[in-house]
Amino acid sequence: MKCLLHYANFLEMAELEWFTFPLRKADRCLIQYRGFLIRERDAGKLMPSTVSEYMRSAISFYRWALSHGLLDVTTPLWRDKAVYVRFFDSVGFERTILRLTTDLSIPNKTHLGLRLEDGLLPVSAADREALLELAKTSSSQELYRMLALGFFTGMRLGSICDLKIQTLENAVEDPVAKGLFCINIGPGASPPVRTKFGVTGRVWIPKPLLDDLLEYANSLRRSKRQARATSENKYLVFLTRYGNPYCANDSEQSTSVNTEMVTFRRKGMQAGIKVASSFHFHQSRCTFATELATIALSTTDPINAIALVRDALLHKDEATSLKYIKFVTQTPAKQAAANEFTRAFMGINNADKFQP
């Protein structure tokens, strides 16, 4: 349903009808949707796998509509073609399967190289401080605290928007790390807090941030929002000015946050913060994970570092955590290579510059 909703939103945005297929192919809704998806993928707004799934779902919908007589067109919507896929089974024998595809399908072209969660990269410590200072002075109190939670706990936006006041009140200080508290999130926590893949676990939160959130939870600003909220939403830490949750049920996305992030990026560019032009909320989580991996590798072996990152970020498996470890271990080599190339280039430039 999410895929079809995306297609329906595109049709509404482009002011197109789903059942209109003119003779000119470029004017057809499916062709325009395909081009839109490819542009979104190339701009980094959608993952290649997501784009392929969206297009596949749209084609499946039209197959269903045609088979049930809901669509009457005289021109073919696409050309079917057979594709043979070879693979090796668990025993090691080569197998071949026949798949039916179309000329409208979008191949899942993955990017080469190491990619972190959602294909985003962390920001530097200096950029993090600049972004937080900008959010504190130029954005809403809610966005500032959400970004602080992302940068210093690594929680996803869906979990932050579903955070309960009681979750903060139940925080327990880590016995071996003074100044760090632990909060329980996930479907198995009490109260439950939404997490991706339904993983239950503990998240670290610094004491100053915890104290600030508890103070905000009892502030007049939030009390006014709580008064407008329904009984089931009154105990959420973050509420919109209309008393609604920032994220819909079972959603990792927030329209309110996305809208404010657009304004935030614009103000960041005006303030001269270059990283703000392409900054996404999820980069706060990437930044936390990268810094945690760096600290972990400096104090323990890679195996324990992977386990630490996995537990702190509530990864479903260790494969995602391993990406951060690899990213951190590759960074010094990249920096050394960049410095060497810069020195070599400057040497060539200077030699040319002062050559008689």
Where are these regions (language model features)?
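N-terminal core-binding DNA-recognition domain of tyrosine recombinases/integrases
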Residues: 1-94, 133
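Conserved tyrosine-mediated DNA breakage-rejoining catalytic core shared by Y-recombinases
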Residues: 163-212, 223-229, 233
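C-terminal secondary-structure termini that scaffold catalytic or DNA-interacting sites
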Residues: 339-356
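Catalytic-site neighborhood detector that most strongly recognizes the C-terminal catalytic loop/helix
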Residues: 313-338
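Active-site/catalytic core of tyrosine-dependent DNA strand-transfer enzymes
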Residues: 206-276
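Short, charged phosphate-coordinating catalytic segments
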Residues: 68-72, 150-179
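Short, basic (Lys/Arg/His-rich) helix/loop patches that form interaction surfaces
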Residues: 258-311
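Basic, Lys/Arg- and aromatic-enriched nucleic-acid-binding interface segment
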Residues: 125-157, 305
